[in-house]
Each structure stands twice: as C-alpha cells, then as structure tokens.
Amino acid sequence: MPQLNPNPWLFIMLMSWLTFSLIIQPKLLPFTPINPPSNKTPTTTKTSPWTWPWT
C-alpha cells in the first residue's frame, strides 16, 4: 500500500505547491471577470398586503 509510505509526502506536497504558485496562479490572475461589479443603488419595491379570501 503506497499511501502508507510517508517518505514522498513532503516532496509531493512541495512540488504541488510550487506547481500551483509558479505555473497555474500566474495564468489565472490576468483573467478579468465577465460581469464586473457595478455601483448600483438598491431599489425598494412597495409591497401590498395579501388578500385572504377565507377570513
């Protein structure tokens, strides 16, 4: 059972972290969101009470 052998764990975790931080992260950071947030004022709608026909 190779998962019980803890010898390569540190190396695998370090290589995973380096791969993410040096290769994947710079490729993901330049993307801009499709719908950027805008400064909209919240609109309040007037609610009317429900009519209860059985009272």
From Swiss-Prot:
Bilayer disposition of the protein: Single-pass membrane protein
Chief place where the protein resides: mitochondrion
Cellular-component GO terms for this entry: mitochondrial membrane; proton-transporting ATP synthase complex
Pfam families: ATP-synt_8 (PF00895)
GO MF, any single term: proton transmembrane transporter activity
Entry keywords, A to Z: ATP synthesis, CF(0), Hydrogen ion transport, Ion transport, Membrane, Mitochondrion, Transmembrane, Transmembrane helix, Transport
GO BP, sorted A to Z: proton motive force-driven ATP synthesis
Low complexity bias locations: 37-55
Job description of the protein: Mitochondrial membrane ATP synthase (F(1)F(0) ATP synthase or Complex V) produces ATP from ADP in the presence of a proton gradient across the membrane which is generated by electron transport complexes of the respiratory chain. F-type ATPases consist of two structural domains, F(1) - containing the extramembraneous catalytic core and F(0) - containing the membrane proton channel, linked together by a central stalk and a peripheral stalk. During catalysis, ATP synthesis in the catalytic domain of F(1) is coupled via a rotary mechanism of the central stalk subunits to proton translocation.
Assembly notes: F-type ATPases have 2 components, CF(1) - the catalytic core - and CF(0) - the membrane proton channel.
Name of this chain's protein: ATP synthase protein 8
Organism: Corythaeola cristata (Great blue turaco)
Annotated gene: MT-ATP8
